[in-house]
Amino acid sequence: LIEILMACKQEGNPDMVFKFCSTSKVSFPGSGVAAIGASKKNIDFIKQQMTIQTIGHDKLNQLRHVRFFKDIHGMVLHMRKHADILRPKFETVLNGLKNELGDLEIGSWLEPRGGYFISFDALPGCAKAIVAKAKEAGLVMTPAGATFPYGKDPQDSNIRIAPSYPTPEELAVAVEIFVLCVKLVSVDKLLEEK
């Protein structure tokens, strides 16, 4: 991936981007340290706004993070631990999708290189029905279209799969249920279109 701030600067548009990040899913959920990256002009603007919005940042929480991570190398080591925990979970889901849906042309997905989600695209008009059918079977998922503004997916096709919480064993069962729901809803959709 290109570094977007540098790319915008090189193209003469340094003020187009604000980058936000947080350690919220890395360290303490809901208590992470956040950061903003932007051009000097945009950072100056943000500082003006924040001056009147906050008395001061949670310095004890910042200190807690510095003591825990120490430096960028500590952050990298910690993220490798996260990857070691998440990798088998993602592999379980991705292998299930590939083995059960790979050649059927009723869904596609992105294999993420980081992050906490797998983006699955069903046939248009099927995502809400798939999530509803999964819920009937006891599998609770992120609402269909959650990746779109206001949750309104114009194609009703996107489902965000979040494999980080369940165990790999629970995920194996969840994937079986999910792919079965994808197949059932897709068959209904294809028969409806004939």
Annotate each PLM feature.
Residues 21-24, 106-107, 145-150:
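Short, solvent-exposed loop/turn elements at beta->coil junctions and helix N-caps
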Residues 43, 47, 53, 117-160, ...:
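Conserved C-terminal alpha-helix-loop-beta "cap" of PLP-dependent enzymes
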Residues 6-87:
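Conserved core segment of the aminotransferase class I/II
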Residues 1-4:
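Conserved PLP phosphate-binding loop immediately N-terminal to the Schiff-base lysine helix
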Residues 17, 107, 139:
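Short, conserved active-site loop motifs that form the nucleotide-linked donor/cofactor pocket
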Residues 13, 136, 152-194:
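PLP-dependent enzyme catalytic core of the Aspartate aminotransferase-like
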Residues 80-94, 106-121:
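Conserved glycine-rich beta-strand-loop-beta hairpin in the small C-terminal domain of fold type I
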Residues 21, 35-37, 110-111, 117-121, ...:
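Short beta-strand segments
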